[in-house]
Amino acid sequence: MMKLKKVFIDIGSILRSIWMIGMQAFSKRETRMYPEVPYIPSPRYRGRIVLTRDSSGRERCVACNLCAVACPVGCISLKKGESTDGRWYPKFFRINFSRCIFCGMCEEACPTAAIQLTPDFEMSDFKRHDLVYEKSDLLISGPGKYLEYDFYQFSGKEILDKKKGDAIKESKPINVKNILP
């Protein structure tokens, strides 16, 4: 009697499996055939890292090194230089994408909105050393996500022709000795 009961349970299990497979055969497929059907990631997808320019066409990066410090895997390296008008810029800016985990910490740490993550995800390569991108590979011609932001309008740093407090939307420096009781 126990063997007969086990046979019916096994047959029922087999029929239920066939029924479930049959139902899935006619349902919509979740798998996309990637190269033929393009994948469109969400707008907040963190992909390829780019360096942007401000509205006047100059690069936004001031080589403050905050992105390199914030990076948990240490894949960003740069060196600061200073131009004749007093602006800082990176002499070199290098990201090793073979180590990058695309966490977005560098984008959050950047005070100038120079470093931004785009939804581009097709970055594979055959050689590891080809995944080390230099500044020329990362620098794009546009402002990226933040169209009107210009760090030097808000920073309070002296630039060649403007003193502190003379830039757009910047108040004059406060003399602390004048406000003492």
Swiss-Prot record:
Function: NDH-1 shuttles electrons from NADH, via FMN and iron-sulfur (Fe-S) centers, to quinones in the respiratory chain. The immediate electron acceptor for the enzyme in this species is believed to be ubiquinone. Couples the redox reaction to proton translocation (for every two electrons transferred, four hydrogen ions are translocated across the cytoplasmic membrane), and thus conserves the redox energy in a proton gradient.
Residue numbers binding [4Fe-4S] cluster 1: 61, 64, 67, 110
Class of the enzyme per the UniProt entry, highest EC level: translocase
Binding, [4Fe-4S] cluster 2: 71, 100, 103, 106
Domain 4Fe-4S ferredoxin-type: 52-81, 91-120
The EC number(s) this enzyme carries: 7.1.1.-
The protein's required cofactors: [4Fe-4S] cluster
Gene name for this UniProt entry: nuoI
Family: Belongs to the complex I 23 kDa subunit family.
Catalyzed reaction equations: a quinone + NADH + 5 H(+)(in) = a quinol + NAD(+) + 4 H(+)(out)
Keywords: 4Fe-4S, Cell inner membrane, Cell membrane, Iron, Iron-sulfur, Membrane, Metal-binding, NAD, Quinone, Repeat, Translocase, Ubiquinone
GO BP annotations, alphabetical order: aerobic respiration
Protein name in UniProt: NADH-quinone oxidoreductase subunit I
GO cellular component terms given for this protein: plasma membrane
Cofactor descriptive note: Binds 2 [4Fe-4S] clusters per subunit.
GO MF annotation terms: 4 iron, 4 sulfur cluster binding; iron ion binding; NADH:ubiquinone reductase (non-electrogenic) activity; quinone binding
Native source species: Blochmanniella pennsylvanica (strain BPEN)
Self-association state and partner proteins as the record states: NDH-1 is composed of 13 different subunits. Subunits NuoA, H, J, K, L, M, N constitute the membrane sector of the complex.
Membrane topology: Peripheral membrane protein
Highest taxon above the source species: Bacteria
Keyword check for Isomerase: no
UniProt subcellular location: Cell inner membrane
